[in-house]
């Protein structure tokens, strides 16, 4: 992401909140997903990229150590006043070695670990896939919770396959143990798979299950699907797309979302 695009995203948050900003509705620290800087880290290096993140005003990041040793990366972030409340894992690691996930999170000082993907055949996420995910998340989430870490599943749009009177995402939320498993709402993917008003619907329907949020907007006029993919140009500055940000932030805060991260 280019620097001016990040600034537009920050401005978009403020403009879309309008008078609600003055009422201090948006009280979250300004966070960013380090994936946003995926083109910077290999070229500029970790230290200079973290300098840019600090310069832009971010005080929290979500993500990995970008190839650097965990302790060294944590120190570089600490030196810049940047915390790492959430880091990532993948589905297979949760199955094979949840304690490795715990160790990494604790080294980084992360309270949350998010899993952003469930293996499946593209466009054909099934009940069997959802059932396996529920089992994996409940088992791994228990291990993480026993060690002071909260597992969050990050939705990606493909989970909105119809099921009974709702979707397979509904199935996953209802069948994961809320003591062990929470969720990270990616606003763009939630709209892409479920419709422009789906973020508000989910935050109202499951007000305590979402602990993290990716602040992303979907270009106006884009009709989503269930593939979990869309061209990069459909990711637009917050407030310029389909999201009703006043309502989303209001419901997020009311429901207990603890950290928000801009991502592009």
Which residue ranges define each predicted feature?
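Bacterial Sec-dependent N-terminal signal peptides
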Residues: 1-26
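Generic structural signal for well-ordered alpha-helices
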Residues: 49-50, 70-74, 98-102, 134-141, ...
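Active-site acidic/histidine proton-transfer and metal-coordination neighborhood
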Residues: 59-60, 91-182
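Acidic/histidine-rich catalytic cores of soluble enzymes
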Residues: 146-242
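Conserved, mostly hydrophobic/aromatic
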Residues: 32, 53, 61, 77, ...
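A cross-domain feature marking catalytic cores of carbohydrate-active enzymes
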Residues: 32-36, 63-65, 86-91, 115-118, ...
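N-terminal pre-domain/capping segments
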Residues: 21-112, 182
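Acidic-and-aromatic substrate-binding clefts and catalytic sites of carbohydrate-active enzymes
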Residues: 38-43, 60-72, 89-97, 120-124, ...
